[in-house]
């Protein structure tokens, strides 16, 4: 479980650092989408809190990380689909977001956190029930 804690803490730390970098360098989020900036601040705070929680109450923190990453991923995908500021064409805003490497990196990191947390929950339950293609045969 220690390895899972380290990997999950690293992923949450990367998520928090990328979020901080976006907040520090993205002028558009502060000028055109202030509520998005506040939401990102909340997600950064949750990521930082979950880093410490993973080492104290692992099961609750893993579930919290899954929920936080899921909500953040859905919110970010919602921004891509229809979260453009007033007066700006959706395609322009979508291209702006998808050209921003920090945004795409944060989006990818949320998927990674979700995969880690689901894997942490699922692996103990799969013991002895691996699909045939994944089963290691020992003679």
Residues of each region from the PLM?
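Topology signature of small-to-medium multi-pass alpha-helical membrane proteins
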Residues: 1-139
């Amino acid at each position: 479980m220690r390895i899972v804690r380290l990997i999950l803490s690293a992923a949450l730390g990367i998520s928090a650092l990328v979020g901080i970098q976006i907040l520090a360098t993205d002028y558009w989020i502060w000028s055109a989408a202030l509520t998005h900036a506040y939401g990102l601040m909340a997600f950064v705070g949750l990521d930082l809190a979950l880093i410490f929680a993973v080492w104290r109450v692992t099961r609750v923190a893993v579930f919290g990380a899954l929920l936080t990453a899921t909500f953040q991923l859905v919110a970010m995908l919602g921004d891509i689909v229809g979260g453009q500021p007033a007066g700006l064409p959706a395609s322009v805003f979508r291209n702006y977001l998808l050209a921003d490497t920090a945004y795409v990196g944060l989006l990818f990191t949320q998927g990674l956190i979700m995969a880690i947390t689901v894997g942490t929950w699922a692996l103990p339950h799969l013991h002895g029930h691996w699909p045939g293609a994944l089963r290691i045969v020992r003679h």
